[in-house]
Amino acid sequence: MLVIHQRLPARSPRWDEELHLTYEARSKSRLRCFAASGEEVGLFLERGQPPLADGDCLEARDGRLVRVVARSERLLHVTCASPLELTRAAYHLGNRHVALQVGDGWLRLLDDYVLKAMLEQLGATVEAIEAPFQPEHGAYGGGHHHSHHGEAEFNYAPRLHQFGVRR
């Protein structure tokens, strides 16, 4: 088994192996899967990190470099007649904490018939496609929770904005 514990800070121009993974698989810090060659792989990455992205490189325990490839998956490709309508669609999806890939004049999300119906009700054009999914990571670092229990554990600094010092 190819055992991987480390993400590399930069992409590498060369690699020894590839992992073709869906977005869900790239979001896990612990995963048993298979490399493109068929070799069994065990991922044991640091918890609390952003999902792996297409092109990211990992280092295996035996020194081999492994490149991550975003596997194509079934997505909804959303367009609207105006920027305002697209903004409304993004608002309603964000209100439901849906992972979104944002492009110039379009949104993409994992295929979901309930969200498709909602988007069509909002006037969006929704097309089912097969493509790699690379959603936004979000504005804040660390984990996601709504509880104030154990607040110190989850006291992550904002990545985009500094609103003030938390004590």
From Swiss-Prot:
The lineage of its organism: Bacteria, Pseudomonadati, Pseudomonadota, Gammaproteobacteria, Pseudomonadales. It comes from Pseudomonas aeruginosa (strain ATCC 15692 / DSM 22644 / CIP 104116 / JCM 14847 / LMG 12228 / 1C / PRS 101 / PAO1). This is Urease accessory protein UreE. The gene is ureE. Keywords: Chaperone, Cytoplasm, Nickel, Nickel insertion. Belongs to the UreE family. HAMAP family: UreE (MF_00822). GO terms for cellular component: cytoplasm. Its main location: cytoplasm. Pfam families: UreE_C, UreE_N. It comes from the Bacteria. It is found in: Cytoplasm.
